[in-house]
């Protein structure tokens, strides 16, 4: 960091929040073919090289503090306590797949522990919390404190966070800046609340809550008028007027699953406390870790981490 910046009392460090679990998994799916046995060495090399690439990108743009955000479903996600069907389709798809999910997850969990012990990054990893939770809570915190923030993720769910000042999002998958589809962060968010988000098993307010998990062949989701989405996005009180009673009840369910402003206060507090109390390993540990872990090729580029 520039010495002049450090001496400037008004200087606020740029912070990069990396959607670690999404980036690591998407990279692994591209690099490891079906039926190939995945081991710790393979996953370690892939993750460290991915981190190096994204950290270099962030620091080049002036975001010098790096925060890795982890999905931790060891005891199941907290949203599944509220809605049993949440992301249940993913487990079903994994069971039918010939990709080595067990080898990948076992290895990635070990690498996450290594990152906590040896690498100079804050690793946000709390049982039952998703990377989305960490990113949403910390974006709000850092933005209100005056920091500029870079989210590194290809996930379109984060466009609702673009409403905060000084927030940008880079998609490493598409190698471009993520823009709000509708031009409004509020409309993007409300579209998913009302129409649902199939990839997470969240259904439209016009059908039963577990529609995507229990759907039978031939069932369709009724359409939702864009004018209704926009009206409720601009004034949420309109939801009571424009939706039927059953749709309004479903709307309230979807708020908890999709709108980051509805992350429970106790979860947000736990995230902030975890961040504030995190003890960073010294940079001096990187070299010994690389040598011990068989990453000697990376020792020449330690400054890029």
Swiss-Prot record:
This is Ribonuclease H. One of its GO terms (molecular function) is 5'-flap endonuclease activity. SMART domains: 53EXOc, HhH2. Pfam families: 5_3_exonuc_N, RNaseH_C. Keywords: DNA replication, Endonuclease, Exonuclease, Hydrolase, Nuclease. One of its GO terms (biological process) is DNA replication, removal of RNA primer. PANTHER family: 5'-3' EXONUCLEASE FAMILY PROTEIN (PTHR42646:SF2), FLAP ENDONUCLEASE XNI (PTHR42646). CDD domains: H3TH_T4-like (cd09899), PIN_53EXO-like (cd00008). It catalyses: Endonucleolytic cleavage to 5'-phosphomonoester. Plays essential roles in DNA replication by removing the RNA primers from lagging strand fragments. Exhibits 5'to 3' exonuclease activity on either RNA/DNA or DNA/DNA duplexes and endonuclease activity on either flap or fork DNA structures. The keyword Transmembrane does not apply. InterPro entries: 5-3_exonucl_a-hlix_arch_N, 5-3_exonuclease, 5-3_exonuclease_C_sf, FEN, HhH2, PIN-like_dom_sf, T4_RNaseH_C. Its EC number is 3.1.26.4.
């Amino acid at each position: 960091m520039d010495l002049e910046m450090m001496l400037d009392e008004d200087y606020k460090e740029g912070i990069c929040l990396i959607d670690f679990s999404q980036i690591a998994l998407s990279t692994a799916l591209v690099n490891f073919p079906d039926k190939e046995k995945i081991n710790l060495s393979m996953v370690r090399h892939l993750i460290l090289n991915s981190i190096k690439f994204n950290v270099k990108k962030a620091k080049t743009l002036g975001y010098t503090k790096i925060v890795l955000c982890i999905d931790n479903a060891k005891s199941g996600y907290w949203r599944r306590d509220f809605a049993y069907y949440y992301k249940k389709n993913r487990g079903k798809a994994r069971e039918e797949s010939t990709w080595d999910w067990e080898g990948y997850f076992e290895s990635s969990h070990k690498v996450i522990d290594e990152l906590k012990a040896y690498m100079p990054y804050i690793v946000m990893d709390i049982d039952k919390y998703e990377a989305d939770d960490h990113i949403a809570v910390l974006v709000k915190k850092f933005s209100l404190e005056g920091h500029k923030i870079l989210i590194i993720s290809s996930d379109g769910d984060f466009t609702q966070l673009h409403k905060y000042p000084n927030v940008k999002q880079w998609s490493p998958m598409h190698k471009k800046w993520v823009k709000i589809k509708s031009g409004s962060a509020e409309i993007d968010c409300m579209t998913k609340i009302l129409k649902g988000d199939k990839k997470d098993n969240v259904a439209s307010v016009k059908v039963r809550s577990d529609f995507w998990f229990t759907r039978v062949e031939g069932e369709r989701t009724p359409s939702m008028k864009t004018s209704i989405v926009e009206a409720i996005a601009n004034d949420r009180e309109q939801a009571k007027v424009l939706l039927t009673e059953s749709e309004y009840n479903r709307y309230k369910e979807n708020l908890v699953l999709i709108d980051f402003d509805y992350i429970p206060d106790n979860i947000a507090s736990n995230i902030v406390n975890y961040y504030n109390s995190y003890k960073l390993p010294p940079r001096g540990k990187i070299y010994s870790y690389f040598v011990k872990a068989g990453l000697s090729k990376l020792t020449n580029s330690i400054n890029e981490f």
